[in-house]
């Protein structure tokens, strides 16, 4: 079997998410061709698929060492850096890609995803719009690519509370793909279903038709359309049907992922144990002038509404679900995916701390 055939096999494994097969096969070929940037890139993508981002970063850096203008490797490196919280480095790479090739759609899309991650929705919107404007001028672009970018744009508009723009984009998506589950679910989140509103009742019928068309094996779509239908019937106060669809969605998720209550209990006990004997008030850390309000609660328990009410005060800014606390905790107190109690104690005893 020649090299081209072997690489095609690896590409096929990558497409169907057989990431370990890709890594195993690439290692054999890289022993013979250690500087092949294409092989290094797909190996990095396989590690990326397994969330082994440190390994993926090594592969992408090796690819770029031998081929500095390999934009695919550069884009993938930016994605892995983004995944581990190195947002500035990721941002610089996306911008560098777009300087080299201003029409590189993946970079626009991924850079926009980064903007969304840090709640810069206006910045994300501009990047998604630019990606879409490029695609509009291209021939033979798969509908899934077009609707994918449009859906990201619609979600960014919604996050920026630009409802009319969101609805306009969703209509465009459904004109291309009437069965687009994400667009139907997003539509459902924007409207209040009512027996007196013909459009909303029509939308329920459309979603029920989409539900019939989806194979039960297509788990994510089935779950999303079931949640959307559950919400619509909840609005109509038809709780029997609402429960049917919500229960169906939950059962599908459970069947796929399962649940380990004992593991959850153990994780909670470990968190409590870590902080036993640590007096958080007895610290050398200088108090901050800025006061931070955390709003915690179970899903669908009213935390979003509570945040909106509190944020309506002139001296309060509602920041939404931020990633920064998670990044700081990960960087300073976690080793090998576990919190280290001694690190927390050491940090508490410092007089001044710069941890970002």
Task: Tell where the protein language model's regions lie, with residue ranges.
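Conserved alpha-helical positions within TPR/SEL1-like repeat arrays
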Residues: 11, 38-49, 72-83, 106-117, ...
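TPR-repeat structural position
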Residues: 19, 53, 87, 121, ...
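Phosphate-binding active sites in nucleotide-utilizing proteins
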Residues: 286-356
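Structural marker of alpha-solenoid helical repeat scaffolds
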Residues: 32, 66, 100, 134-141, ...
């Amino acid at each position: 079997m020649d090299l081209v055939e072997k690489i095609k096999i690896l590409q096929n494994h990558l497409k169907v998410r057989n990431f370990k097969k890709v890594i195993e096969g690439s290692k054999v070929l890289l022993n013979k061709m250690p500087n092949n940037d294409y092989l290094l890139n797909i190996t990095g993508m396989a590690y990326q698929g397994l969330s082994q981002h440190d390994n993926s970063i090594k592969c992408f850096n090796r690819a770029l060492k031998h081929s500095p203008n390999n934009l695919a490797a550069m884009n993938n490196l930016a994605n892995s850096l983004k995944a581990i919280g190195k947002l500035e480095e990721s941002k610089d790479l996306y911008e560098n890609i777009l300087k080299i090739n201003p029409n590189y759609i993946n970079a626009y899309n991924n850079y926009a995803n980064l903007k969304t991650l840090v709640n810069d929705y206006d910045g994300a919107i501009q990047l998604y719009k630019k990606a879409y404007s490029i695609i509009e001028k291209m021939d033979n672009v798969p509908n899934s690519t077009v609707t994918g970018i449009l859906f990201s744009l619609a979600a960014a508009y919604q996050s920026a509370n630009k409802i009319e723009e969101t609805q306009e984009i969703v209509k465009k998506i459904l004109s291309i793909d009437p069965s687009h589950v994400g667009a139907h679910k997003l539509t459902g989140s924007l409207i209040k279903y009512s027996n007196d509103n013909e459009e909303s009742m029509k939308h329920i019928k459309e979603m029920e038709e989409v539900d019939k068309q989806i194979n039960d094996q297509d788990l994510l779509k089935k779950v999303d359309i079931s949640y959307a239908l559950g919400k619509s019937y909840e609005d109509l106060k038809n709780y029997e049907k609402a429960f049917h669809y919500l229960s169906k969605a939950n059962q599908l998720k459970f069947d796929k992922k399962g649940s380990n209550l004992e593991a959850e209990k153990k994780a909670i006990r470990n968190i409590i144990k870590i902080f036993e004997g640590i007096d958080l008030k007895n610290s050398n850390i200088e108090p901050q002038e800025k006061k931070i309000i955390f709003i915690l609660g179970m899903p669908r328990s009213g935390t979003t509404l509570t945040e909106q009410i509190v944020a309506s005060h002139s001296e309060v800014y509602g920041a939404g679900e931020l990633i920064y606390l998670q990044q700081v905790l990960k960087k300073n107190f976690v080793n090998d995916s576990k919190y280290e109690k001694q690190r927390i104690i050491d940090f508490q005893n410092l007089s001044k701390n710069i941890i970002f």
